[in-house]
């Protein structure tokens, strides 16, 4: 049985951070990151520079997402991509209640499992007011979740919306 190789998160972050004029992107898509790595990432001060964080196609669950959402270093995030992870309604609730995500403009959660209640949590958020792009494709949000998103006062400014 092969041992799973430990991820050198510091090296991965330094290799993958991309600085452009007025924005800094960190693409950690499909790197096998789980909750332990996301918890360590949440403690990295370099995140204060990051405006675009791509964590798609990893093994992040609600637990890791909760830690990330509480990080004081994510206040400058404008784009958060969490597609294809293991996020449920509890993770959606963490995002909805995260004061540190008040500058978020794009939230990509496609191919997760937030369900109806997760969509309702997002729709009732008091901090996601700057979101203009919201992608909840393949999250089983159903009619109740879709209605909550479409009628949400928080998401009035959304110009790009993708639901089930």
Give residue spans per PLM region.
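Compact recognition or signaling/catalytic modules
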Residues: 26, 31, 99-107, 113-117, ...
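Conserved hydrophobic beta-strand positions in leucine-rich repeat
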Residues: 24-28, 51-55, 77-82, 104-109, ...
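Alpha-helical adaptor scaffolds
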Residues: 54-103, 108
């Amino acid at each position: 049985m092969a041992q799973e190789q430990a991820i050198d998160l510091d090296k991965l972050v330094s290799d993958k951070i991309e600085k452009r004029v007025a924005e800094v992107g960190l693409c950690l898509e499909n790197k096998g990151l789980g909750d332990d790595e996301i918890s360590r990432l949440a403690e990295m001060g370099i995140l204060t520079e990051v405006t675009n964080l791509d964590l798609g196609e990893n093994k992040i669950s609600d637990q890791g997402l909760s830690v990330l959402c509480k990080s004081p270093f994510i206040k400058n995030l404008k784009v958060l991509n969490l597609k294809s992870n293991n996020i449920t309604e509890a993770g959606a609730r963490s995002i909805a209640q995260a004061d540190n995500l008040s500058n978020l403009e794009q939230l990509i959660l496609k191919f997760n499992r937030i369900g109806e209640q997760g969509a309702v949590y997002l729709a009732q958020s008091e901090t996601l007011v700057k979101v203009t792009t919201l992608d909840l494709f393949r999250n089983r949000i159903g009619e109740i979740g879709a209605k909550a998103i479409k009628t949400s006062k928080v998401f009035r400014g959304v110009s790009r919306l993708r639901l089930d």
